[in-house]
A protein has these predicted regions:
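Hydrophobic/aromatic-enriched cytosolic interaction surfaces used to assemble or bind macromolecules
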Residues: 1-174
């Protein structure tokens, strides 16, 4: 994914946030070298819990409705917007912690991965709050897809597969 950055990300500090269900992991890389690694307890399941509480769904119903984009009309204003703000602030705090605990004072790119990374407005809000160019990681970028692959679904879910693709690629990269 870093290879898709300008100049293939050479000499760039890349902050990779993998937003999981319960944990968000920050990894800062430069030229494929891991410089920093920290986890924080904040993830996509908090959004599902908010949906569940607000609308009276079970957790499982809330998750299914979230994935199917089958939520009440006020969802974006009442739940999604404030959640995107909170998640963006958590990302900003994690970066500030990185800056205060290392000699670095900036990153060149913020890359978002994990199922929650595709939330509408998240990339833009992170850029706005941090001042750093943000993007959603897509491990399938530039890859030729077979005819049986449902491209729209794959593109939508691509950030969720970043770790799996990285692990699979390790076998082929010397």
């Amino acid at each position: 994914v870093v290879a898709a950055l300008p100049n293939e990300g050479k000499d760039a500090l890349v902050a990779l946030f993998e937003i999981g269900a319960d944990t968000t992991s920050l990894k800062v890389l430069r030229d494929e070298e891991l410089l920093y690694d920290r986890d924080q307890a904040f993830g996509g399941s908090q959004l599902t819990q908010l949906i569940s509480r607000q609308y009276g769904f079970s957790f499982e119903e809330a998750e299914a409705k979230k994935l199917a984009n089958d939520l009440p009309d006020d969802y974006e204003q009442v739940i999604l917007g404030p959640f995107v703000d909170s998640l963006s602030q958590e990302i900003g705090r994690a970066l500030q912690y990185f800056f205060t605990s290392t000699p670095h004072h900036k990153v060149h790119y913020v890359m978002l991965a994990g199922g929650t990374a595709s939330l509408p407005g998240l990339k833009e809000r992170v850029t706005e709050l941090t001042g750093f160019a943000s993007m959603v990681g897509n491990p399938f970028e530039g890859m030729k897809l077979g005819g049986a692959v449902r491209e729209s679904k794959l593109r939508r879910e691509a950030p969720s597969y970043l770790t799996a693709c990285g692990l699979a690629m390790r076998r082929f990269v010397a």
